[in-house]
Amino acid sequence: MGLDAVKAKGNWKSEKPKETENKNHKKKNGDDNKSRNEEEEEGEASGCWVKFRFMIGCIPSKSDLDASSSSIYGSNCTVTTMESKSANEKSNDQPVGQVSSTTTTSNAESSSSTPVISEELNISSHLRKFTFNDLKLSTRNFRPESLLGEGGFGCVFKGWIEENGTAPVKPGTGLTVAVKTLNPDGLQGHKEWLAEINFLGNLLHPNLVKLVGYCIEDDQRLLVYEFMPRGSLENHLFRRSLPLPWSIRMKIALGAAKGLSFLHEEALKPVIYRDFKTSNILLDADYNAKLSDFGLAKDAPDEGKTHVSTRVMGTYGYAAPEYVMTGHLTSKSDVYSFGVVLLEMLTGRRSMDKNRPNGEHNLVEWARPHLLDKRRFYRLLDPRLEGHFSIKGAQKVTQLAAQCLSRDPKIRPKMSDVVEALKPLPHLKDMASSSYYFQTMQAERLKNGSGRSQGFGSRNGQHQPVFRTLSSPHGSSPYRHQIPSPKPKGATT
């Protein structure tokens, strides 16, 4: 199930149409060039890079690739970068240990847009194999209206297929799916695609997004996922005007915890997720949480070993400090990231937000003094909840977040213990708005002229700096880019 034993070779390239160099070219060549130019004009007319850029970027041009595949329905729109990006691609990402606005590019793995791939696919028997034409028709020819989102590495489209087959069906019927494409301009996207199919294709759990199938046809690589109609947790917490109700937040926290617990303690081969964050938690129609995007997932260390040494990857603000400092990855790194997300759900604040006052940019550092102080914990609560939260539940969440965010990874709880702690919280009815304490506290703050602003976050502004930036328009899966930090000596990827 790992990425190490691999054996399918092919050249992976994407070429833009070339202009005619000689007016006396044969008629056949002239017709070919004319056809390519018509495709370009059609793409520009669409008002979106879907037609032209999609055909040249999202969907690779024909080449000699035999076996490979593409796309991730998760934090990015096509395949995300794992160790590097193609040399000609710009990035807004940054290493996990640094916060800067400088643009960084890494080509540690690939310095060409036509890398030679040599990897092994471990495709599960339950996955459906689609033809490219099936997916083209299911998404209505990849038209802009079907576009769920786009990112630096490709696009995600909404499609409809047979309930138990691969044939396309009329929109609104059959099974709704998300079809993700792979931009072939770099080895890293392919590596993350391999991780996605090798992990998510072999892991089945109610709290993991289901991989329905794949397409490997010439140099076309696409992946097909179950459609998640409510999009990402990030979208609901930070991009919508109506606040997410407390009980729903707790339901989502519990579901996400169950997903991590399965990966760490129940999977046949334990897995470290390595990229747990709000944008990778997708929601179905009933707000059931499912983890998406396994592009950075790693096999847990073998028995007798304490950690995996690897290049630091992920999103700034979520990565555990010991992992950032040493590159030593353990399941407790995921537990720390869970604590950050729990804090985001509690406060309504992003893990990193430079639009906030000095001292409040980093959510964890700002929140630490309040986490274990019963007199100050109320300052953490999302003001948009307006007292519609369980007092006991909020106290339990702050305690749990403090444990998960411990600087000593050995003190952090196992995810199975987190699940047990969260189970009762969605059903608690002791709303703060009806308590004398909360009403008195609110009155005192108003009297002091602090209103909601003291310790409470307003609506968040720009997204935090990341090595993989994210967005989730139209309920689609989020997108991200990432930038690796220097690789530790002897580390693997």
Swiss-Prot record:
GO cellular component: plasma membrane
Keywords associated with the record: ATP-binding, Cell membrane, Kinase, Lipoprotein, Membrane, Myristate, Nucleotide-binding, Phosphoprotein, Plant defense, Serine/threonine-protein kinase, Transferase
PROSITE patterns with a match to the protein in the record: PROTEIN_KINASE_ATP (PS00107), PROTEIN_KINASE_DOM (PS50011), PROTEIN_KINASE_ST (PS00108)
Sequence positions that bind ATP: 148-156, 180
Subcellular location(s) of the protein: Cell membrane
Residues that bear Phosphothreonine: 131, 306, 310, 315
BP GO annotations: defense response; lipopolysaccharide-mediated signaling pathway; pattern recognition receptor signaling pathway
Effect after changing residue 180 to E: Loss of kinase activity
SUPFAM superfamilies per record: Protein kinase-like (PK-like)
Residues bearing the modification Phosphoserine: 279, 309
The UniProt record lists the keyword ATP-binding: yes
Entry PTM: Phosphorylated by SD129 at Thr-306 and Thr-310 in response to the pathogen-associated molecular pattern (PAMP) 3-OH-C10:0, a medium-chain 3-hydroxy fatty acid.
Family: Belongs to the protein kinase superfamily. Ser/Thr protein kinase family.
Subunit field text: Interacts with the Xanthomonas campestris effector XopAC/AvrAC. Interacts with SD129.
Protein name stated in the entry: Serine/threonine-protein kinase PBL34
Lineage: Eukaryota, Viridiplantae, Streptophyta, Embryophyta, Tracheophyta
